[in-house]
């Protein structure tokens, strides 16, 4: 363990280095001198005359030595409000700008045309941003990498094993009975939890329990009883660990994770303990499921992946862990926000109810095939994900020199794709601040597909997309059939970035039985 004296010496050395670097450079503007792109750099569809500028010419906020733009970010509300700051920067600097946050340097994209250009030049194995805190933990504990941090052919091999089950609609549709089983219990729990005004204390936590039970039944054929009065403490600990991990890794993305590890900071300790808890929960579930495998091809979701695709136990642990934590947090978050949006838009809610009742008379249980006849329900989810996304941005790391807009970007450049900025732009969506699901059903006015990317883009799109959509669509059917979702106040609710976007306060919604 590092002694306090060593920690102080390291900190003093860091501050002296910062002082010695002198004054920060002036903010870069788009008027910087241009340079011609190297011949080997492919021009994207936006280029016409071949004239490009290099990456140092990109506009952006002031870049202080070592700190980058962290001081300005903190002044504007900190990392919790960085999504709002990024939207402000796009208005100020344009569709593409460069920003450095501590040790994290990236180029930000905020237009559909730039994202389309990136997609058209995508390689066979596109790279994501290196999530250094996750890698540091896996190396520290000798665990394998999952799909979020694997790269190259190893990423493709593991992804191929999972996408056979997760990306084929016919395979996902088979899971509706399991999802409905959990939803039936969840609706009963909602009845129990609603107070005399129809409010549910800590609704987000209850939605986490629902999403946890759903993904565990799909993966392990196991229920944890979180929707019952007597719940397993282990499952609650898992959910808490996910939230801790999500809230701590961002801090180590903008400051050197090696420094946190060396100094054994509280952030590193909390992050490591959270991952320990997550793996401790997942491993026994996987082991027990594999031991009970029936040996019948196609009979078991998890075991088929393991047996047919020759993954190692460590690879399975890592991939399933990442899949489960993403499913628990983002699916619950998406359902929470659409319930909020429907509560504030009763006209849209009435139209949704009419559609559901026309397809499912007498409160029938929804099935996957029923969703084909519910375009407005799907439009409601799309609109909610546009207006209040779970994740405000995704990333790429260029694996070759590429030209985007008027800038030649070298290999290794980290790109931040600001998908929330796309969804909130009037250039892409008329009345972008309004919840209007019907915009997705207009035949005469098509929406640019690169203006709405809630699950990412290209080959590294979220592998759990179809499963998440099925869970959310079925959940909406169940809830809208039984409850009128009402707003208990009309005060604005801010979004805070804690790994994903969460409300700044308890959501003011209530559920009144129909």
Curated annotation (Swiss-Prot):
InterPro entries: CYP11_CYP27_families, Cyt_P450, Cyt_P450_CS, Cyt_P450_E_CYP24A_mit, Cyt_P450_sf. Disulfide bonds: none annotated. It is found in: Mitochondrion. It catalyses: calcitriol + 2 reduced [adrenodoxin] + O2 + 2 H(+) = calcitetrol + 2 oxidized [adrenodoxin] + H2O; calcitetrol + 2 reduced [adrenodoxin] + O2 + 2 H(+) = (1S)-1,25-dihydroxy-24-oxocalciol + 2 oxidized [adrenodoxin] + 2 H2O; (1S)-1,25-dihydroxy-24-oxocalciol + 2 reduced [adrenodoxin] + O2 + 2 H(+) = (1S)-1,23,25-trihydroxy-24-oxocalciol + 2 oxidized [adrenodoxin] + H2O; (1S)-1,23-dihydroxy-24,25,26,27-tetranorcalciol + 2 reduced [adrenodoxin] + O2 + 2 H(+) = (1S)-1-hydroxy-23-oxo-24,25,26,27-tetranorcalciol + 2 oxidized [adrenodoxin] + 2 H2O. It is an enzyme of class 1 (oxidoreductase). Heme binds at residue 462. This is 1,25-dihydroxyvitamin D(3) 24-hydroxylase, mitochondrial. Its EC number is 1.14.15.16. Residues 1-35 form a transit peptide. It comes from the Eukaryota. Its cofactor is heme. It comes from Rattus norvegicus (Rat). Belongs to the cytochrome P450 family. Keywords: Heme, Iron, Lipid metabolism, Metal-binding, Mitochondrion, Monooxygenase, Oxidoreductase, Transit peptide. One of its GO terms (cellular component) is mitochondrion. The gene is Cyp24a1. PROSITE patterns: CYTOCHROME_P450 (PS00086).
């Amino acid at each position: 363990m590092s002694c306090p004296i060593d920690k102080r010496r390291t900190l003093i050395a860091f501050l002296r280095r910062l002082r010695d670097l002198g004054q920060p450079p002036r903010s870069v503007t788009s008027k910087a001198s241009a340079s011609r792109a190297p011949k080997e750099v492919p021009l994207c569809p936006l280029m016409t005359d071949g004239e490009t500028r290099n990456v140092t010419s990109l506009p952006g906020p002031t870049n202080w030595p070592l700190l980058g733009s962290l001081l300005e970010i903190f002044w504007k509300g900190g990392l919790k409000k960085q999504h709002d700051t990024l939207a402000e920067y796009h208005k100020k600097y344009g569709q593409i700008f460069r920003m450095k946050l501590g040790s994290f340097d990236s180029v930000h994209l905020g237009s559909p045309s730039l994202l389309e250009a990136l997609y058209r030049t995508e390689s066979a194995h596109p790279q994501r941003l290196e999530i250094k805190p996750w890698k540091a933990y896996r190396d520290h504990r000798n665990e394998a990498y999952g799909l979020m941090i694997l790269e190259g052919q190893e990423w493709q091999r593991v992804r191929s094993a999972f996408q056979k089950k997760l990306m084929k609609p016919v395979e996902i549709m088979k899971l509706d009975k399991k999802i409905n089983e959990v939803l039936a219990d969840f609706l009963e729990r909602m009845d129990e939890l609603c107070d005399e005004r129809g409010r549910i204390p800590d609704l987000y936590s209850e939605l986490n329990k629902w999403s946890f039970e759903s993904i565990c039944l799909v993966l392990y054929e196991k229920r944890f009883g979180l929707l019952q009065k007597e719940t397993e403490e282990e499952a609650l600990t898992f959910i808490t660990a996910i939230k801790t991990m999500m809230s701590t890794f961002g801090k180590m993305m903008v400051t050197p994770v090696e420094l946190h590890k060396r100094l054994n900071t509280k952030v590193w300790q909390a992050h490591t303990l959270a991952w320990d808890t997550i793996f401790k929960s997942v491993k026994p579930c996987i082991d027990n499921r594999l031991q009970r495998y029936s040996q019948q091809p196609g009979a078991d979701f998890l075991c088929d992946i393991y047996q047919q695709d020759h993954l190692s136990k460590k690879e399975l642990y890592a991939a399933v862990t990442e899949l489960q934590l993403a499913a628990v947090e983002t699916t619950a978050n998406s359902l929470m926000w659409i319930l909020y949006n429907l509560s504030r838009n009763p006209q849209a809610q009435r139209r949704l109810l009419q559609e559901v009742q026309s397809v499912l008379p007498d409160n029938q249980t929804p099935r996957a095939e029923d969703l084909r006849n519910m375009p407005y329900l799907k439009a409601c989810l799309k609109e909610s994900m546009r207006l209040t996304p779970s994740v405000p941005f995704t990333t790429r790391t260029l694996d070759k020199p590429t030209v985007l807009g008027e800038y030649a970007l070298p290999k290794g450049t980290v790109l931040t794709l600001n998908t929330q900025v796309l969804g909130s732009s009037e250039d892409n969506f008329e009345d972008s601040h309004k919840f209007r699901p019907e915009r997705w059903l207009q035949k005469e006015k098509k929406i640019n597909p690169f203006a709405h990317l809630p699950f990412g883009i290209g080959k590294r799109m979220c592998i759990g997309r179809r499963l998440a959509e099925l869970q959310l669509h079925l959940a909406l059917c169940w809830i809208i059939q039984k409850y009128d979702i009402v707003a208990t106040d009309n005060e604005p609710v801010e979004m805070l970035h804690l790994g994903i976007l969460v409300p700044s306060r308890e959501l003011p919604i209530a559920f009144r039985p129909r």
